Structures are given as structure tokens and as C-alpha cells.
Amino acid sequence: MINITKPLTPKSISQQKQQQQHPYKNISTTKSNNNPQASGSKSFVQEKYPSQLYESEIKIHNQSLAEYDLDIYDIMVNLIETNKPNLSLYKQQPYLTFTIRLKLIDFLLKMSIRLKILPFVFFKAVKIFDRYCSKRIVLLDQSQLIITTCLWIASKVMGGNNHFVNINNLDKIGHENFRTINDLGYGCGGKYLGPTERFRLPKLHELVKLCGAKCKYDQGMFKQMEVHVLNTLEWSLNDPSIEEFIIDSHEFNVININNNNEYEQTITTNDESANANANDGNEFFKIKEFLSYAALYSHDLIDTNIIELGQVIMDLINETFQLQPFDKHYQTILNCDSDHPIRFDMQRYKHIKKAVIKSVLNASDFMMKVFHSKGPQFIYQQFNLQYKLNYTTNSIIGGFGNSGYSPTTTTTTTTSDNISTTPTSSTGSTTPVSSYIGYANSRSSSVSSTSSVASSSNANTPSSSCSTTSTTPLGMTPHKRQKNYSNYSNYSNYSNSSTSLGLTNNNNNNTTISPVDSTTINSHTKNSSQLNYQYHNGGSNNNNHHHHHKPSLSVSIPPPQMHSHHHSSTVYQMVTPPNSANKNSNKSNSANNNNTTTIATTTTTTTNNNNNSQLPAPHQLSYNNYFNSPNMQPPPPMKYTPGRKQQQQQNQGQNQQQPLQLYQGDNNNNGTNTNSKFNSIAGSRAVSSSSSSAVSIASSISTNNYDKYDDDDDDDNSNDLFSSSRRFMNYSNYSSSTINGSVMSGVINNNSGNGKGNGNGGSGTPISENDSPIYTKTRLCNMIH
């Protein structure tokens, strides 16, 4: 039996020289472990791997494989086709959707960075996971366990130059024969720096910890899942990965890397061009790694041949940097030349290229932070500038670090089908792309399989949903769109903007406004999506509004009725231009009375047709503020029968009768003049469509005044009180009966202060515009839905 406690091999010459130079290395590891001060005083320096030896090894390797290169290539292609995931079977997963898959991939990327996994091990792990998902049903509670186990398997299969000793087995193998991490700073056999990067395999307790306590995984579950995954894949893990076709050996060489002084630079010459070439080679490596990782996020590329994917990545790099075959950094597949090109169908080529571009444009925040170097940032910006998206160059330039950029941006709606694989020139008044680097961390981590519309929201509202469509470009991030509108006198300068953010245009030309809570809007800031509507008169009799006649949207958008800003002075700003909103109150009241008399004679058919067309958006309402709007029509009377109302008010105390008397008193003040106007225009039906729609908006909104009289019904019939369907159905009857005062006549006559109400008098007339009720968000939402 071999005595493993003795040294297996004699010390090499370099070890003897190093021991002579550093005599303190003779100290035993046992003493160093017992004496932490002695171990802390040691200093170990890794030797650089000889570059001459590296070049010689590469030369001999190429000569050995030159005779069998075609056979090896055929075997690799066969393995790729055999171990390719099946997308049709992947789509039959009952629980694992593509959205969940993308979240799992994002989680695995974070874990690989946390564990300092070597490059492209993450790519191999995702491919193993896709193969497993093509053969087994994945439960959601086991999804993290499966994909983490795939990372563990991939790190074992292609872990690279791993010479670290498992510290848990030191007692069995003899700790005196090996230099461990504790006393050397690097693993056994790691005395050389290079030629490739070394790393430590992830331990099970680290995987359990990184998955989180909520998952409740243990080390035994990882071991069982590892065997289960290997049995499912039939232990076939030797299929090549993408780095074997797009990465050269010298790009894996860490000796010449100058990445933030992480490794010492071995270039001793003072030639700056040599340093630049070394840095450029590292940047091209990062670009290929970035494009490969981004392609994993596209479900369209799950079953794509990795050789074809690598060819598309190489072509994208050559197109972006305009590299020619005679250039030093020209990218090819497996050293192929014009005699043996990679050939495949052009339609599939365009499909792969389009999917890769979409994946890059939808890169998450975390990925852009990982690939923060100049190369990936540059190619990301070039993709935004070159390929045809539905935004102009001015919108991109205006979004970069310019708080006062021009607001005349065009439509920023971007769809996934509008990406052309033909690059367009980025000439014109554009900023240098190098100045854009540093703004790439503003991407959303959200991925979905459907096309979305880039909508402007509050700057503090993160978009957490997932999307595989082309999202807002880097220069059009939401926090770059906010403008200061505290000075409302400059409103006319911004009203000509043609931004269509916050709107969703459906196929039937119906336009909806994206709901934004009014409480999230700053008191000194207006979102551009709330200002740049195309207003139109539509034959309205209200001439107090000044409209800007510059159409900017293809769909005619009705003007919102109300909007509020929470100013300390309680001065409310209308959505309409402030020139009309700040008119004298006396003039507006007189105009309102004229509008009220005209609107009251509208027919039932006109009112019902426009009920749902111009409802204000939820973000245009306030929670507890009063409005004195010239566009408001008094609300309809209460829909309860006089007999029920009389019985309810008889059971109530004096505190419930007093508000009703105030309500009656206000109506008595305005009753006479209003009824005389009603009688003068009773036969007139010539009312404009915009006026009738204003009736439907104001009449369909329930008010807080109803709560004052119906508090006893909140327990049993609260749904009836706030029901929008019954209010819409019964408003036509109320509008006709309100003119004659027949609906509320019994209630008013029995509860008025002087008891002089009559059936045709002014006692049943609704309140005037100056006594506008409170608009609540809850009731409006109930009406809309």
C-alpha cells in the first residue's frame, strides 16, 4: 500500500529556488494554523506562466489536430444535433413558462457572478437546463433546485484549471503534502498565474445558502437532483459549447489581461500599441460573452444550433465594428476561411439575428452592470442607433444627461416586429457613442413574450414585469422624461410636443389613458404624457378654452375633464391650457349657467351613446379636493324612491336632517332662474356632441354627498349605492324628470326648511357648478369597470 503521507514527487528546481528565496516557507502548516500571527506574516507570489511555453503548446496542439480536424468537426456537429433541446416539447410544460424561465436565468446569472464561475460555464448550465426541460416536467417549487444543480454540473464538466484541494478531506490525504487555500492564498498546483483562469468549484453549502431559506433545500436534495438530471440526460454532457467555436485560446489567456489591475500585466515593453491591442482583445472577448449570454434570454433560440448562433454573433461584431477579413480582430468560426464557410438557410439566419438583437436591446440592469466595460456598452449603444426602431435620433440624444433637452420628441412606441436586420447608418446630428457609456444601468429587468408599448410613468415606478420586446432605448428611460412645469406660463411651449407616451392605441382606434395615481405626481412636475394630447372643440359651446391646433397623434384624443395638483395654496390646475382655466370666476360662472341650461335639454339617446367615450382617467382625479370646473354638469338626483327616502329620514336623527336642509336651501336659491331658462328652451334639441358628452361624464360620477344621506345603507346595500351599471341605466330617466322636479318633489317638500316646494318649482333642481361635489377615485373606478 502506498504511503500517501510521504511526498509523491520530489521538489522541482523552481520550488527549491523559491524555497531558498523564501526560507519562511519551511514552516509547517500545523504551526501556521496554530499561530495565526505567523500565518498572517507570510507573503506568497504566483509565478507567471511562461509565454514561450504557452506558444509552443498551442503550436503543437494545432499540428496534432490538423490531420483530424474535419473528423473532429463532424463529431462535434453530431453531438450538437443529438443533444439539442426540443422547443416543441418545451412549450408543453404545464407550469414552466418562458417568463419564469427568464427569471430563472437571471437568478442563475447572479449566482454565477456571486460564485465567481468561469466564463461560459453559465451558458453550458442553461443549455443543460433546457435539455432537461425538454424531457421532464418541471415543478415551480423545484425549478431553482434544478437550474442550480445544472450550474453545479456544468462547473464540474468544464470547470477549467481547477487545482484546489477539498479542505474537508485533508485528514484522509495528508495535509502536509499539499498547500491549501488557508496558507497559500491559492490552491494546490496554482503556483502559476495563467495561462487560464483558476477558480474553486462551488460547494453545496454555498448553493443551499444562495438559494435562500424559503426554498428549504438541503445538500441531500442537490445530490439526488444531480443524479436525476444526469440520468435524464443519459450522462451525455460532452457536447461542445459555444465558446469552442467563437473564442480563441489566446482570449482565455489571463496573462495579457489588464482588467482593473486584477492581474499583473506581463507586457514589459513601453509600446502603447501593444497595450491597446491587449485591451482590445479582452474587449472583444467580453463582447462575445455578452452576446452569448443575451441570446440565452430569447426563447426563440432554445433549439438553435450553436454553430449558427456563433456565426451570427461573429457577423454582428464584424458589422458593428466594420471589420474586414484583413483586419486583426476579424471574427470567424473555427478558423474557417472562404473555402469552407458556414452555410445555412438565409431565413433562419435572419430569424437568429433578429432574436439576438432583441435580446441585446432587452438586456437587464444586472447584465449591463456585469458587462460594464467599453466593448459591451459600445455594441449595445450601436444596436440602439443602427437598427430600425420607432424612435428618432433626437429622442436618444435628448435623453442623455440633458435636463433641458428639447421636448419635441416623436412617437416612442417600439414593437418587436419593427426590428430590421439591415443596419442603417447613424449619420446626422448624433453624439459620439463613447459619450453614452455609463448610462446602461437604466434598463428594466422585465421580460414578456408579447409586444409592448413604451409608456411613460413616474420616475420612481420600476418596471418589474418581463418582456422580450424592444423596450425603451437607453436614452428614453422614464427618469429622463420628467420636466419641470412649475411655471405654467411656459405651458404653450410644451403643448406642441408630439409625444404619445402613456397611451395605448388598439386596433379599433380606441384610445385609453394609462392610469397613474395622482398622489405620485410631484407638485412641481408634470408628466409629459398628461400634457401632450390633441385637443379638439368638436362643436362645443364652451369658448373659454384655447386649443393648440397642431395635430400630433393619429387618433383624435378627447380632452380629459379634470386634473388636480396638490399645491399648498389649493389652487387647482386644469388639463386645459391655463389661460382658460384662470379666467375670472364671475365670467366662468355665467358661462356655466348657460351651458347648464343647454345641456339639460339633451336627449336620452345622445347621453347614453357618449357615457363611456370621455370618462376621465384615474390619474385625473383627486381624493379629497373640490373642483369648480366650467365643464362639470350637476350630478343626477338620488335614485331612491321618495317613499323609501322619507322612511329613512324619519328614522334618522337631527344630525342627518341638517345636511339635507342645506342641500335643499342651495337648490331653492337657484331654482327660479334655472326653471325659467328650462321653459324658454324646452323645445330646443340642437345641442353639440361635446356638450352632451360633458353631461354623461359629470352625471355618471357618484359623489360624496350621497354618503351624507345614505350612511345607514352602507352595511347592506353599499354595492347598490356605488353601482355604475344602475347609474348608467337610470340616468336617462333622472335627467328628464329632473327638469320637472318630479323625482325629488316628495323629499324636498317634506324636508325643506319652509315647506314651499312644489312639483314644477325649483326645489328639484340640482346644485349649481359652484357647489361641485367631491370626486373620489373609488367611485370613478367602479364606474369605469
From Swiss-Prot:
Keywords: Cell cycle, Cell division, Cyclin, Virulence
GO MF: protein kinase activity
Cross-referenced Gene3D superfamilies: Cyclin-like
Induction: Transcript is detected only in the apical cells of hyphae, suggesting that HGC1 is transcribed in the apical cell. Induced during hyphal formation and upon exposure to host serum. Expression is regulated by the cAMP/PKA pathway, EFG1, FLO8, SSN6, RAD52, TUP1, and UME6. Repressed by farnesol and linalool.
Entry-linked SUPFAM superfamilies: Cyclin-like
Gly residues composition bias: residue spans: 754-764
Biased composition (Low complexity): 447-473, 484-512, 579-613, 646-679
Polar residues bias (residue ranges): 22-42, 513-535, 621-631, 765-774
GO BP: cell division; cellular response to neutral pH; development of symbiont in host; filamentous growth; filamentous growth of a population of unicellular organisms; filamentous growth of a population of unicellular organisms in response to biotic stimulus; filamentous growth of a population of unicellular organisms in response to neutral pH; positive regulation of filamentous growth
Residue ranges constituting the Cyclin N-terminal domain according to the UniProt record: 71-238
Location of region: Disordered: 1-42, 408-433, 447-679, 750-774
Domain of life where this protein originates: Eukaryota
InterPro entries for the chain: Cyclin-like_dom (IPR013763), Cyclin-like_sf (IPR036915), Cyclin_N (IPR006671), Cyclins_cyclin-box (IPR048258)
Family classification: Belongs to the cyclin family.
Role according to the record: Hypha-specific G1 cyclin-related protein involved in regulation of morphogenesis and opaque cells filamentous growth, and required for both conventional and pheromone-stimulated biofilm formation. Required to maintain hyphal tip localization of actin and SPA2. Regulates the CDC28 kinase during hyphal growth. The CDC28-HGC1 complex phosphorylates and prevents RGA2 from localizing to hyphal tips, leading to localized CDC42 activation for hyphal extension. The CDC28-HGC1 complex also phosphorylates SEC2 and maintains CDC11 phosphorylation throughout hyphal growth.
Subunit structure: Interacts with CDC28.
Protein name, as recorded: Hypha-specific G1 cyclin-related protein 1
The species this protein was found in: Candida albicans (strain SC5314 / ATCC MYA-2876)
Organism lineage string: Eukaryota, Fungi, Dikarya, Ascomycota, Saccharomycotina
